[in-house]
Amino acid sequence: MPETMTPSEIVSELDKHIIGQQKAKKAVAVALRNRWRRQQVADPLRQEITPKNILMIGPTGVGKTEIARRLAKLADAPFIKIEATKFTEVGYVGRDVDTIVRDLAEMAVKQTRESEMKKVRAKAEDAAEDRLLDVLIPPPRDIGFAQPEEKDSNARQVFRKKLREGQLDDKEIELEVAAGMPGMDIMGPPGMEEMTEQIRSMFAGLGQGKKHRRKMKVHEAFKLLVEEEAGKLVNEEELKHKAIANVEQNGIVFLDEIDKITSRSEHGGGEVSRQGVQRDLLPLVEGTTVSTKYGMIKTDHILFIASGAFQLSKPSDLIPELQGRFPIRVELDSLSVDDFQAILTQTDASLTKQYQALMKTEDVELVFADDGIRRLAEIAFSVNEKVENIGARRLYTVMERLLEDLSFHAHKSSGETVTIDAAYVDSRLNELAGSEDLSRYVL
């Protein structure tokens, strides 16, 4: 379970996908572990222990967002990643910051429902199986004889065996299922998400309880009936209470692009709204109560992780109150040639493995030689230095350019083996990488 993972185990999991940035990984791992530690503390003191929010500072493409993505998969907790630039000050047209907590609540309810459904899945499958057998072999009318019941029982066992073995999967049956409301989306004005959600939930309940007959194949019917039966076994009210508790105690919010809402004294214009977003974030990060359709949610123990490149601004450009709410500062390093080489070879789903898998579908064997990978890393680093530093994302453009012709003519090279060595890389990329004007527009 993720909550019992030690910080070193969390870091080793992140190492599979992100190269370097040990400071950021350690900070995130400790913050995640502290959620578990807090749960072990006795109650009066537990309420006083609040999470220490993290601010990650570093150039674009070095792993800030990737750490958040991998953390979301790793943390068995309600997690939401949002861009700070999406929000506006209350009173302006746009989304206000309270929607962060509402979205987190939606995520938690979905997560809790999936978890509860898994617990009752075995019972739901049995009930769905019985309902399918009732359709395949309608039960006989009661006419006072015992013998037909025995025959029916034997027939049910035969059909049950066939059903479990998948022999009846393609048989078409007519089934009575719960009628869902026709898909209807309500487009509300910006900033009125709560009202729109209330109207949507009001209309959602209109079609409940109604049933209609549908023709479908047995395997489709089984999936539908399992969902329906599991829904009956799950207590919705209890589910909502669990979800709210999960958000309040374990919720994690990743605020990306926080540097884009800083106020810079030398720039005028839309600074009022930007500062307003920072002021609106203050109570949310410090701890407040937000109204959602599932109930009131306290944000006191939600962990906030913010990140930004801070190329045009500094962390000190944030309003002082917000700076104080992010006590842990972590600086991420720019990527070196060795880092680029490691990204191409050591990560679990590296670009080289992805392209090899894609070419394999055309029966083309792609082999990356060590000197070829080193040359790719050098070119990516060089272009970043000369033009604009976009971090690891530069590898996407370099790799696409390198394999452009091969990808286009792959169907003609079926059964061949293509080796990507330093000479191959130079023949495709040297001219582009050497010319600053060309690399500016092409790479």
Swiss-Prot record:
Detail which positions bind ATP: 19, 61-66, 256, 321, 393
SUPFAM superfamilies from the entry? P-loop containing nucleoside triphosphate hydrolases
**What does it do?**
ATPase subunit of a proteasome-like degradation complex; this subunit has chaperone activity. The binding of ATP and its subsequent hydrolysis by HslU are essential for unfolding of protein substrates subsequently hydrolyzed by HslV. HslU recognizes the N-terminal part of its protein substrates and unfolds these before they are guided to HslV for hydrolysis.
CC terms in the record's Gene Ontology section: HslUV protease complex
Instruction: Give the matching NCBIfam families.
Output: hslU (TIGR00390), PRK05201.1 (NF003544)
Q: Which gene encodes it?
A: hslU
State whether it acts alone or in a complex, and with which partners, per the record.
A double ring-shaped homohexamer of HslV is capped on each side by a ring-shaped HslU homohexamer. The assembly of the HslU/HslV complex is dependent on binding of ATP.
Q: Which InterPro entries match?
A: AAA+_ATPase, ATP-dep_Clp_protease_ClpX, ATPase_AAA_core, Clp_ATPase_C, HslU, P-loop_NTPase
| Superkingdom of origin organism | Bacteria
Protein family membership: Belongs to the ClpX chaperone family. HslU subfamily.
Q: Name one GO molecular function term.
A: ATP hydrolysis activity
Q: Supply the name of the protein.
A: ATP-dependent protease ATPase subunit HslU
Q: In Gene Ontology terms, what is a biological process of this protein? A: proteolysis involved in protein catabolic process
